[in-house]
């Protein structure tokens, strides 16, 4: 994706799901997507939330009382993070929310929606295991317009 070259004005919608945090040069891709969208076209994407990608040792920490917390360190130190995922070592690129929004604006986008995903009360009631997801956002959802 980092080397992709898209035709100018060819699309009304671009969508990406849980990919952008793997790219080292997000700015170049955003410029390509902006160029490829027709005027008024929309770019909608999800990415792992920076609170999720930042920690040097991601994973829940359980204290003596059994309370689970998500460790947050190195948030302002952007760059690659090597993590274990499904038995393999993968490289993610951590960026703050501010950096992601700035890159979108620099590429020419107008940001229309930003959501730090958390399950609803109804979703937690249906699946109590989701309750821990209310303690830290795992996903960042954005919509932007050309």
Model regions and ranges:
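Short alpha-helix
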Residues: 79-80, 91-115
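Adenine-nucleotide cofactor-binding loop residues
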Residues: 1-2, 51
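Conserved class I S-adenosyl-L-methionine
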Residues: 42-80
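Core SAM-dependent methyltransferase catalytic element
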Residues: 107-109, 127-146
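A short glycine-rich, Lys/Arg-flanked "PGG" loop and its adjoining helix->strand segment in the class I
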Residues: 27-42
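A short acidic, Gly/Pro-enriched loop at the edge of an enzyme's catalytic core
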Residues: 2-13
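Acceptor-substrate binding/catalytic loop of class I
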Residues: 47, 51-54, 58, 84-99
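A short SAM/SAH-binding and catalytic strip from SAM-dependent methyltransferases
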Residues: 12-27
């Amino acid at each position: 994706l980092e080397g992709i070259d898209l035709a100018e004005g060819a699309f009304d919608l671009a969508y990406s799901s849980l990919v952008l945090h793997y790219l080292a040069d997000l700015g170049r891709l955003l410029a390509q997507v902006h160029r490829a969208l027709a005027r008024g076209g929309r770019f909608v994407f999800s990415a792992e939330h920076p609170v999720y990608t930042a920690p040097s040792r991601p994973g829940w920490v359980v204290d003596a009382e059994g309370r689970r917390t998500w460790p947050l360190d190195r948030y302002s130190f952007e760059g690659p993070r090597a993590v274990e995922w499904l038995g393999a070592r993968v490289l993610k690129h951590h960026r703050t929310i501010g950096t992601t929004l700035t890159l979108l604006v620099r590429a020419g986008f107008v940001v229309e929606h930003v959501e730090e995903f958390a399950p609803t009360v109804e979703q937690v009631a249906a699946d109590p295991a989701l309750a821990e997801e209310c303690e830290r956002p795992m996903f960042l959802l954005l919509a932007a317009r050309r």
